[in-house]
Amino acid sequence: LVLDEPTAGLDPEERIRFRGIISDLSQQKLVLLSTHIVSDLEAVANEIILLRKGVVLEMQKPASLLEQLNGQVWLVTVPAADETALTKQYTCSNVMHTDGKSVIRLLSESAPRPDAVPTAPNMEDLYLYYFGR
């Protein structure tokens, strides 16, 4: 069964329900799910194939793919005024603003700053690692 973006446009409740259906179907059939909604992959995928222009980049279990990024995802807390310089220099997967500071989640092979804290990679980080800038 091939499903192309099956949860696009669904509200969160329907997305959860539909992912349950996909999971049930996968017990009896091979289900290929094409999506950029990484939360869908986290919820139902036993194995992930990353494709770029028809070429297989990776084909592994989600945990194995995420392990590749260990030590390459960092949290950095900086004054909000310094945010732009970091997000231009590194691939950024998230920014949270609090009390005049920016907590930035960055992808980098080494610590982007001495005060950077390593954090566990997630599927969005994985997506950006392979398909981001």
Task: Write out the residue ranges for each language-model feature.
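ABC transporter nucleotide-binding domain
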Residues: 18-106
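Short, flexible active-site loop motifs that bind/organize anionic cofactors or intermediates
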Residues: 5, 28, 55, 113-116
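Residue-level recognition of hydrophobic positions within alpha-helical transmembrane segments
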Residues: 10, 36-38, 120-121
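Catalytic Walker B motif of ABC-type/P-loop ATPase nucleotide-binding domains
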Residues: 1-5, 10
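Helix N-cap at the start of a conserved alpha-helix in ABC-type nucleotide-binding domains
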Residues: 12-14
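Short, Lys/Arg-enriched charge-dense amphipathic segments
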Residues: 1-2, 75-77, 84-89, 115-127
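C-terminal coupling/interaction segments
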Residues: 94-133
